[in-house]
């Protein structure tokens, strides 16, 4: 499979941060690093990482490209689906553009239709995600993961070994533990930082491609936060608002910014 390395024609029209993201991805591709994009947190990224690929989330939370998407999709469809499709079809998302394979899943009818249309201009692999928790569902999901592994091996002409899968699992577990420990500093009352600051760290960590460095940096950040919390004046107590859902970035974070 030939990796995508060229920049899109509309590159020069992008804002500075988006240009930076494109160039970061371009550097990876120039080193022959495959990129696998996904739209669901259930995506078994460790399987892709075990073959040396970089993984990245693709769900869009900006309404910028919804008008583009509505040329193909119904106006009353989910905004997240339309935004994601709009960024994909317009080449405005650096992560989608440089993804050699996009992994979808059967979480909703809107996304299934989106993947169908995306398949006309991108390599799309759809995983059957069970919608219940049972022995049968677990068996199905295990089979789906093994099928995905075989697909990557055939597509990229590589062998994904158990040893490399275990290494990837260990690395991602270290990431999750570090992020969980950071999240738990918010148990303090008053909180040592506002929710927007915490979210920026959690969300930004998803777009770090040097995953092996993330735990150490997150742990160092946690220590710094706690040291300053003990030594400096505390923030005033405020009401706490719980934001849930996935994805929770972009437009939903207006609530967080409004209460900083």
Each language-model region and where it sits:
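A charged, amphipathic alpha-helical module
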Residues: 1-34, 150-257
């Amino acid at each position: 499979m030939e990796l995508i390395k060229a920049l899109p024609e509309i590159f020069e029209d992008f804002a500075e941060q988006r240009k930076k993201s494109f160039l970061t991805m371009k550097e990876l591709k120039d080193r022959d690093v495959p990129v696998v994009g996904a739209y669901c947190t259930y995506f078994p990224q460790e399987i892709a990482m075990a073959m040396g690929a970089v993984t990245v989330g693709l769900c869009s939370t900006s309404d910028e490209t919804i008008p583009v998407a509505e040329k193909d999709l119904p106006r009353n469809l989910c905004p997240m689906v339309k935004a994601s499709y709009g960024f994909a079809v317009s080449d405005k998302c650096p992560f989608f553009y440089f993804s050699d394979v996009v992994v979808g899943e059967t979480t909703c009818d809107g996304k299934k239709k989106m993947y169908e249309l995306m398949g006309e201009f991108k390599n799309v692999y759809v995983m059957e995600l069970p919608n219940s928790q049972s022995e049968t569902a677990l068996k199905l999901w295990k089979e789906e993961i093994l099928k995905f592994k075989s697909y990557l091996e055939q597509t990229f002409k590589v062998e994904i070994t158990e040893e490399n899968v275990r290494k990837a699992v260990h690395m991602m577990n270290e990431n999750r533990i570090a992020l969980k420990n950071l999240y738990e500093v918010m148990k303090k009352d008053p909180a040592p930082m506002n929710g927007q600051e915490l979210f920026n760290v959690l969300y930004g960590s998803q777009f770090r491609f040097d995953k092996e460095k993330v735990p150490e940096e997150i742990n160092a950040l946690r220590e710094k936060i706690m040291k300053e919390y003990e030594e400096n004046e505390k923030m005033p107590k405020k009401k706490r608002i719980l934001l849930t859902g996935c994805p929770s970035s972009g437009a939903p974070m207006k609530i967080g910014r409004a209460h900083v």
